[in-house]
UniProtKB/Swiss-Prot annotation:
Catalytic activity: a D-aminoacyl-tRNA + H2O = a tRNA + a D-alpha-amino acid + H(+); glycyl-tRNA(Ala) + H2O = tRNA(Ala) + glycine + H(+)
Biased amino acid composition, Polar residues: 65-74
Signal peptide feature range: none
Species the sequence originates in: Methanococcus maripaludis (strain C7 / ATCC BAA-1331)
Keyword Metal-binding found: yes
Gene Ontology biological process terms, A to Z: D-amino acid catabolic process
Protein's job: D-aminoacyl-tRNA deacylase with broad substrate specificity. By recycling D-aminoacyl-tRNA to D-amino acids and free tRNA molecules, this enzyme counteracts the toxicity associated with the formation of D-aminoacyl-tRNA entities in vivo.
Pfam assignment, any one: tRNA_deacylase
Name recorded for this polypeptide: D-aminoacyl-tRNA deacylase
The keyword Transferase belongs to this UniProt entry's keyword annotation: no
Cofactor: Zn(2+)
UniProt GO MF annotations: D-aminoacyl-tRNA deacylase activity; zinc ion binding
Stretches of the chain forming a coiled coil according to its record: none
Enzyme class (EC, first level): hydrolase
């Protein structure tokens, strides 16, 4: 699998991670604009696009996250096209999360106090033709500048890509996760327990259209859709289950 590391000159965390990635001899493709405002035409062809990025939140909680980009609704105020999602590689996303967690728990990094989690689909770019992921340091200016956080991300990238390129990972079921909050606690936990390879994630508050449901099942390899039964509204559960049943898509409560 060939891959492209992408950084943005507008993003301090991205610049921090880029520096560490380059220290290990890797090339990084640099954008003048925000990564979220990029699109397919900005990049050379690659089998995997990996965005080195900041994560921002009002809580300013120290967090290291992984997610695939995409807009689940008509709102594209953070880049990309309305109701469009980029392809997803659940093996990359899950191994990356597990490796971040592994390094984060090491003695030399433990005291940084970072949480590790997935995020649901949100923001651009949405028109990529091959899988992509954002790997992020959050959630404030203070954390974006931490060298050890960038080192955790860099070491995790190297381990993840080596595992994939050498096929040194176990065969497990691949899933799409629906329901729960923005940081997808249920599916983060399943991934860290090494139960499944978790790919696309969507939150409780998103009302998924048939268009998005069709993209979820066509742009990612998966064995079944996992539904966070307590993490969805009743009417949405009924709608999604009906769609999956009508299309012979395997689903399970999780």
């Amino acid at each position: 699998m060939d891959y492209l590391f992408i950084s943005s000159k507008t993003d301090p965390a991205s610049q921090n991670i880029k520096k560490h990635v380059q220290n290990y001899g890797y090339n990084v493709f640099e954008l003048e604009k925000k990564s979220t405002q990029s699109n397919f035409s900005d990049f050379p062809d690659s089998e995997m696009y990996i965005f080195l990025s900041k994560h921002a939140s009002e809580s300013k909680k120290p967090t290291l996250t992984v997610h695939t980009p995409g807009n689940l609704t008509e709102d594209n105020s953070h880049g990309g096209n309305p109701e469009e999602i980029s392809p997803c590689n659940p093996v990359f996303n899950t191994l990356m999360l597990q490796n971040i967690n592994k390094y984060n728990e090491m003695e030399e990094y433990k005291e940084l106090g970072f949480e590790v989690s997935f995020e649901v689909l949100h923001h651009g770019p949405t028109d990529l033709k091959t899988p992509s992921a954002f790997v992020e340091i959050g959630s404030s200016e203070e954390q974006w500048q931490i060298d050890d956080a960038a080192e955790i991300i860099t070491n995790s990238l190297i381990d993840t890509l080596n595992s994939i390129q050498n096929s040194e990972y176990e065969e497990k079921e691949k899933i799409i996760g629906i329901g729960g909050g923005h940081y997808s606690p249920k599916f983060t936990k399943l991934a860290l327990r090494e139960e499944y390879y978790v790919g696309y994630l969507t939150p409780k508050h998103a009302k998924l259209s048939e268009n998005i449901l069709n993209q979820l099942i066509s742009k990612q390899e998966f064995d079944f859709v996992g539904i966070d039964w307590k993490g969805l509204y009743g009417e949405d559960k009924r709608k999604y289950v009906e769609f999956f049943d009508e299309n012979d898509i395997s689903w399970q409560r999780v």
